[in-house]
Amino acid sequence: MAGNTLGQLFRVTTFGESHGLALGCIIDGVPPGIALSEADLQHDLDRRRPGTSRYTTQRREPDQVKILSGVFEGVTTGTSIGLLIENTDQRSQDYSAIKDVFRPGHADYTYEQKYGLRDYRGGGRSSARETAMRVAAGAIAKKYLAQKFGIVIRACLTQMGDIPLEIKDWAQVEQNPFFSPDVDKLEALDELMRALKKEGDSIGAKVTVVADNVPPGLGEPVFDRLDADIAHALMSINAVKGVEIGEGFGVVALKGSENRDEITKEGFQSNHAGGILGGISSGQQIVANIALKPTSSITVPGRTVNRFGEEVEMITRGRHDPCVGIRAVPIAEAMMAIVLMDHLLRHRAQNADVTTTLPRW
């Protein structure tokens, strides 16, 4: 099974399944001399882990990460960093009734078509549980980018169902269980989640992720454009069905005179491009949005077939998120950080001696 590695110089390889013994990852390309402890990774893992509020899955996983290699006396050595998180709250019996049934909207059917078999326990490798290791790896990238270059990466929920959320106050994002920057909408979000729980249904969401203080020049035309790699990384997150960079699909309704980001002596006058021009960072804030589908793990009955071609009624049991967009916030930050870290190392490897007299804003 290929496709488990992301990045070229900063390379993250993950392994493990939802109901396996553990999840793990190997991270190559981490510069030596970075102060690093398990506590540095745990903060973001705690933001992602299940069972932290009544709005997310009640699977209780502590997600305690262990650093197995690549750190000596509290600093990175420059060698491969190995990380491990044990699974401790699996309930595989919850899935025994569906081992021969293809859950609609899930990867059951496609995994079995591809491999001829599948791990039906919680989706196996296709489960979003795998993203815990991405968050751990992303925490390393976030720390390096912040300490060495002042790059700050943040994400928040900006829509749930038909409830739009304005980015009013980033300080409020970590103060509520929805990662919402709009505290005026918290009551509406709570009411929606209560209604979904009563109905046994789920809802989609939009998450916005931004990166500030990114230097100009990151990105490798033409096939490794920065926006292409960011979109690739974000699209790989479970349940993501769409990615926008900057204005995204909104550019369809704009004229060229409206969409172009004019430049004056004071700098760019707008940021419809989302901080990336020609696949290369401009020095502006990088902005991306992701659309996440409503999970298909719901108790509303639906039709499907089993492995024998028989039509059956499907009701998904187990512990699931009514809105996967909530816990996608730290995952989106991690994927943005991994891509920026990789491109920063690649840029420095080739262009470390490049200097220009162009202004930077």
Swiss-Prot record:
Its EC number is 4.2.3.5. Keywords: Amino-acid biosynthesis, Aromatic amino acid biosynthesis, FAD, Flavoprotein, FMN, Lyase, NADP. Pathway: Metabolic intermediate biosynthesis; chorismate biosynthesis; chorismate from D-erythrose 4-phosphate and phosphoenolpyruvate: step 7/7. One of its GO terms (biological process) is chorismate biosynthetic process. Pfam families: Chorismate_synt. One of its GO terms (cellular component) is cytosol. FMN binds at residues 125-127, 238-239, 278, 293-297, 319. Reduced FMN (FMNH(2)). SUPFAM superfamilies: Chorismate synthase, AroC. InterPro entries: Chorismate_synth, Chorismate_synth_AroC_sf, Chorismate_synthase_CS. The keyword Signal does not apply. This reaction introduces a second double bond into the aromatic ring system. PANTHER family: CHORISMATE SYNTHASE. Homotetramer. This is Chorismate synthase.
